[in-house]
Amino acid sequence: MLRRAISVGCSALAAMGSLAPAHAQGEPDLRASYTVVGDGIPKPLTDETPNVENGRRIVTDRQQGLCVLCHSGPFPEARFQGDLATNLAGTGARWSEAQLRMRLVDAARLNPQTIMPSYYRTEGLERVGWQWRGQPVLNAQQVEDVVAFLRTLRDTP
């Protein structure tokens, strides 16, 4: 009986908000290296041109970025936005590209108590399901797409 209750509880937690990895099981891990300078990562993780629209889709997608579970912002298409974290309106005016990249790659480096997931860092994490260990939530291009989108959000609420 206890085993069934644990199984049901774990299934419910997984359904409520599991972060899907950026690449499927069995695919090679092609994470780019990066250098932290101060409170940012100045160089892009990829040489590809960022796709702002894809960045918006990731931010508002409850199955991929999950940003709107905690953040709100100027995205009317995203219903039931969160209020646990900062409103993303004005993000592009508040933080530089390097600072935004750092917050996505490894927010805990700036604030060890944060509840924001590390979307790109994979080492030293806790409570990661075995099937996702060693896999980033977003790949390098997706991180750059989100950074590019957030940089467009210049107006404050």
List PLM regions with ranges:
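Short pre-active-site segment immediately N-terminal to redox-active cysteine/selenocysteine motifs
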Residues: 62-66, 74, 142
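C-terminal capping alpha-helices of c-type cytochrome domains
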Residues: 101-103, 119-157
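Electrostatic cytochrome c docking/interface patches
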Residues: 28-62, 157
